[in-house]
């Protein structure tokens, strides 16, 4: 696992550091799973061969540094009892703040990732996250934690939407007047990210949606509330950075006209110093 060091300037009284990681994609199963389920996990594990090793590295690095840590979604690849048990122990041991990703809703009932199963997972997402929530200490759909005078806000956007409840809670935090680091799984659309040939953003504009397949439009088209929330996020001076994952690449916004985003990729532990 590589460590990428980033410095951000917020004008805090006392500089501090924290860690961010994302998209570990754990694939644990046990004797309670069917052989077909275990074979599916082995196949998925070939796509994420360092998942368990990365979790161990993070444990050691948090213990060594004492830095707070945020995970921005897809801690597990799909839901199994073994994955949930591991996540509970891992999060409690590291004190990790967790934001849900799109895989925290993934049942994969037919032991495959396909549009039909994914659509079913989306429809029962609230029920699923209610059950998954029991294994995490913070609210994985909306959470706020103050560190060093900065509000760390986590919003679950794993369904490519922001709910009215999340939006209202965000506005309440903004009203406190403190600088905000906003953690989400899926990054906001930006021309920079589009130039890297990725098509998995929050609130892509209509001109981009016009190039998508019908399935991508179904998955990613933002509703009016989400569009309003994204415009609000872009307009708020107190929201200093959006920090996220999902794309499996490392990226930091360079264009000064775009909202500042930090995207962290697979097998990366980002160490962020706030000054």
PLM features per residue range, with description:
Residues 6-10, 80-179, 207-209, 252-274:
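Extended active-site neighborhood of metal-dependent phosphoesterases/phosphodiesterases
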Residues 44-48, 73-77, 156-161, 215-220:
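The substrate-binding groove and active-site-proximal loops of carbohydrate-active enzymes
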